[in-house]
């Protein structure tokens, strides 16, 4: 029986690429750096925004100082415009409702900075109760480190012995490795930022193309 489902945010629950790209390009342009199409920026997403900026900066400009100044320009812009084009993926709201109706606990584990993670979840899913909504926080290792999953287990009051009752759902290799590190079952989703081939490298228990398939997986574990 499934007791807890943990979701990644960007590329799993929400389509966020356009707003992330706009904020990144705003910050790059501010300092005279070349910008990137959103399709390219999509390939930079997954390891937190500092890594995103490092990937977006030109060769020879990837210093910590430059990353931090891009971050300083990015955050206020993204805080204001982070919901301009962002939207839930098809079937996500229905999936969350499906889980809620079955009293399955729901959580978010994201490498997006905490303020934005909380804001987006509250804005797009106000009717859903989450046991934990965790993003990137200072002093806490980012995914694929398993710390964020361990913190969610504590918040959900689920013991280590119950790991077979947990599903971790994400769209990237980072997510699949997080599930491996946390010793929980992974579901890779193909509607996000990464190709199926990247997910397959980590041999998750399932790779799905639709939210209905996730509902079927949950139902099969009664």
Regions found by a protein language model. Give the residues of each.
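Alpha-helical substrate-recognition element adjacent to the catalytic core
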Residues: 22, 30-60, 76, 90
């Amino acid at each position: 029986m499934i007791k807890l489902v943990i979701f990644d945010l960007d590329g799993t629950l929400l389509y966020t690429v356009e707003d992330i790209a706009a904020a990144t390009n705003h910050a790059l342009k501010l300092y005279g750096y070349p910008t990137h199409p959103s399709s390219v920026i999509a390939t930079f997403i997954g390891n937190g925004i500092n890594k995103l900026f490092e990937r977006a900066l030109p060769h020879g400009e990837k210093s910590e100082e430059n990353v931090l100044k891009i971050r300083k320009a990015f955050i206020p812009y993204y805080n204001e415009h982070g919901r301009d084009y962002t939207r839930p993926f098809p079937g996500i709201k229905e999936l969350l409702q499906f889980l809620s109706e079955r009293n399955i606990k729901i959580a978010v584990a994201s490498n997006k900075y905490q303020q934005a993670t909380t804001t987006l979840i509250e804005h797009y899913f106000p009717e859903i109760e989450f046991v934990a909504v965790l993003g990137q926080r200072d002093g806490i290792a980012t995914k694929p480190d398993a710390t964020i999953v361990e913190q969610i287990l504590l918040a959900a009051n689920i013991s280590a012995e119950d790991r077979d009752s947990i599903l971790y759902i994400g769209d990237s290799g980072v997510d699949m490795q997080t599930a491996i590190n946390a010793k929980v079952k992974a579901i890779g989703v193909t509607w996000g930022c990464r190709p199926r081939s990247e997910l397959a490298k980590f041999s998750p228990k399932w790779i799905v193309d639709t939210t209905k398939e996730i509902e079927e997986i949950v139902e099969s574990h009664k």
